[in-house]
Structure formats: structure tokens, C-alpha cells
């Protein structure tokens, strides 16, 4: 699949979707995008910047949701034009899709909305690449039906993203078999290594997370075989305004990605999966 100027697929080099969970400020967005662009250029990893202008599914009414549509989209436009990177953002049922699609390169549908047929089809109809996150409640073999809804709009630029599955209350686990199963859809499979360590709503109305497990799960996913990696990162995760406990420190990204790139190259050299 052609994606933002590069080829995405199981037999292609690993690509990265990364950035802060939510847009906190223009300065932070430009800083992180510039840092990640330079790092990925050095490592020769295709890169897409991500951040959200509205986190509509925060645990608490008092949680920071973002700068809103107009300001957030303006910041993403500056990231794209000033830093020179493709951008991804998530959209919701009330998002003005035409306006967002005029700026961003990739649309993302939230996990909680993956079963909303009208929503999935409206997003796919924008004819932009779409990263569809698998719901925490959904079996991996059910993703073929979600993908079919999107492709029924004539859009073949669809990705399937694994972000963990509910395991009791306030806990997620990663079933690596799901990566293999979702590959059967024929879509590039992306692994979200940061939301997969989230503890949803488990901290008195605020989601917690187990950041220390991000490297292990990311390495496991790369070893199983994926097309892309999704990671939320922040210069100061402990003070991030959203999803800090499951964000990876920006200054540790390069070291982690060096090991993941090496693992991806080994997998793609010896794999019989393609």
C-alpha cells in the first residue's frame, strides 16, 4: 500500500506513527515533530506525526481534551508545512471531516467507534489513508468486517491497528496472535505499543499505565511481523496532559527504535510469512 510517499506492507521496512497523545501547545507540537523527523531520518524509518486536537473519550469530565478543532487543526497544518512531515489525527462522529481531510494526511478512527458502520464509512469516503483501531472488546477475526465496511466506500488505503484487549477491569493485554489474524485482511497491520500498556480508568477517574512494558511488547510485535508501529511519546511523560503513564520518553525513542529496526530487519530477512 502506498502511504505518505512510501510503501507500507509486511515485506516493507517498518514505519513509525508517533507524537504526543494530545496537542498541548504549538511549541510542543513543533518541537516533538522536529525531533522525531530528524531521528527517523538518521535511522531511515518512514515517519508520520500524530497528535489529537480533541480527545473525546477521556475518563473524567475534568480531563484535558485538547485545544479544539480550529486551533488544533491550525497547529497540525504548521507541523506539516514547517517541519515537512505527514500528519495523522483521530476523528470522531461530529468532526468536520472535509476540513480535517484538507489538512491531514491520515485519518484515524478511535477503538471505541470501530463498530459504528456509518462513522467508519464516512471516514473511509474521504479517500484518505485510514488507521482503524481495533476495539478493546473486539476479537481480531471480527476486524475483517470493519475493514470491509471501509473498503465498500472504494478506499483501499486502510490499516488495521491493534491496541490491546480488555482483560478484566481496568487492564489490557496484547494477544500477539491478533497481529497474524488481522494480516489476513490484506491490510497493513499497525501495533500500538503505548496504548497497549494502558490501565483504562484505573486510577480514580484517570487512566494509568505501565510504561516499563512498552519495549518488550514492541519487540514482540515486531518479531511476530507488523507493517507499522504506533507510539505516543512526550518530552516529559510524567507531566503530560493526556496518557502520560503510557507514553514513552522522547529522549529514549532513538535507542528503542534502533533495536526495533534491527529486529524488523531480521524478521523480514528470514520470515516465510510473505
Swiss-Prot record:
It is an enzyme of class 2 (transferase). Belongs to the KdsA family. GO terms for molecular function: 3-deoxy-8-phosphooctulonate synthase activity. One of its GO terms (cellular component) is cytoplasm. It comes from the Bacteria. HAMAP family: KDO8P_synth. The lineage of its organism: Bacteria, Pseudomonadati, Pseudomonadota, Gammaproteobacteria, Legionellales. Its main location: cytoplasm. It holds the Pfam family DAHP_synth_1. The gene is kdsA. It catalyses: D-arabinose 5-phosphate + phosphoenolpyruvate + H2O = 3-deoxy-alpha-D-manno-2-octulosonate-8-phosphate + phosphate. PANTHER family: PHOSPHO-2-DEHYDRO-3-DEOXYHEPTONATE ALDOLASE. This is 2-dehydro-3-deoxyphosphooctonate aldolase. It comes from Legionella pneumophila (strain Lens). It is found in: Cytoplasm. Gene3D superfamilies: Aldolase class I. GO terms for biological process: keto-3-deoxy-D-manno-octulosonic acid biosynthetic process. Its EC number is 2.5.1.55. Keywords: Cytoplasm, Lipopolysaccharide biosynthesis, Transferase. Pathway: Carbohydrate biosynthesis; 3-deoxy-D-manno-octulosonate biosynthesis; 3-deoxy-D-manno-octulosonate from D-ribulose 5-phosphate: step 2/3; Bacterial outer membrane biogenesis; lipopolysaccharide biosynthesis.
